[in-house]
């Protein structure tokens, strides 16, 4: 079975672990009766968070997925590498280099150095990610939504001079923790970008497509902002199953509720499902899973409530199984 997941952030990476647990891929292959040829997992990953930091190209969501599936992620933070040190960052602070609010670990720097060198040599991000994955062996194809620049920027009221300005998502998210007056999101470069060939192929070839319970605005929404992705979803022959990132009007993690309020969407499972919309109309969903106790009615979408707490890969695998069952796909 070929599974393609739209994913971003720590939640997206943990969801991918659950898919691997169910299918016996990656870290779970040794205990599985399935062969690698039986199943294939592809992830179309958000690149809206990508930024130039200290002259290096940083791709947080791609790296979080790569480290998580490769067994090297910091388990406490859910991002970055385990056993990380911060000597380079401390020295940069002593030099007074900005930004001082975005931390790059010493181990993590190696990833960004390789990526930046390959970008400067003319390689597209898709090929670079594949090369980086040779080191981590994540057991999945990690596919940037686009090889082009398509960055999420945020229009805020500056807390110092009260002017309205646009800042990079990372500054809004990491420096300000989304605690400044926020007016809108913009996907800079989207009009000149196109979906990566590998991402489109993964959607077309899938037996089932899943929307991870990632932030619907700045993760899944940023992927959908890439020209060609939404059309590929609507044209796909595979059923599309979405997972609510909202449980009892609160996000599973992160600040999805803050992002939703900016675009005028309530922080409920039903509202997020309607935001995505039914594929039989103008949206992208065939099925929508909400947490036990939540309720949603969405015209044209089959809805079911199941436990959606990703407490460990086994619990997440049961979420994935429930999505397959709802879509009529045998895992």
Swiss-Prot record:
A molecular function annotated in GO for this UniProt entry is: LPPG:FO 2-phospho-L-lactate transferase activity
Q: Which UniProt keywords apply?
A: Magnesium, Transferase
Gene3D superfamilies named in the record: CofD-like domain (1.10.8.240), CofD-like domains (3.40.50.10680)
Give me the reactions it catalyses: enolpyruvoyl-2-diphospho-5'-guanosine + 7,8-didemethyl-8-hydroxy-5-deazariboflavin = dehydro coenzyme F420-0 + GMP + H(+)
Membrane spanning stretches: none
What's its job? Catalyzes the transfer of the phosphoenolpyruvate moiety from enoylpyruvoyl-2-diphospho-5'-guanosine (EPPG) to 7,8-didemethyl-8-hydroxy-5-deazariboflavin (FO) with the formation of dehydro coenzyme F420-0 and GMP.
Q: How does it assemble?
A: Homodimer.
The protein depicted here goes by the name: Phosphoenolpyruvate transferase
Q: Which gene encodes it?
A: fbiA
